[in-house]
């Protein structure tokens, strides 16, 4: 079943491209990029109502895990 989002592909792509551009501008290596994005994620989740944090964290981890390509030939 396809995932339906309340955001347009354009909104998503624009924001993602802006974030990637900033990381590239700073020549951030993978580990630094992941550290920063992880902290941003934590700050966003901690800004939510406490009752929602655990559930959204579990959904986020599940989505991240399922979206990672585990094939060895990706790059």
Curated annotation (Swiss-Prot):
InterPro entries: UPF0352, YejL_sf. Pfam families: DUF1414. Belongs to the UPF0352 family. HAMAP family: UPF0352. This is UPF0352 protein ASA_2693. The lineage of its organism: Bacteria, Pseudomonadati, Pseudomonadota, Gammaproteobacteria, Aeromonadales.
């Amino acid at each position: 079943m396809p995932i339906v989002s309340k955001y347009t592909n354009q909104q998503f792509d624009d924001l993602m491209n802006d974030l990637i551009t900033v990381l590239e501008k700073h020549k951030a290596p993978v580990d630094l990029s992941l550290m920063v994005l992880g902290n941003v994620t934590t700050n966003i989740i901690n800004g939510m109502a406490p009752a929602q944090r655990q559930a959204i964290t579990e959904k986020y981890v599940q989505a991240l895990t399922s979206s990672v390509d585990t094939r060895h030939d990706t790059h």
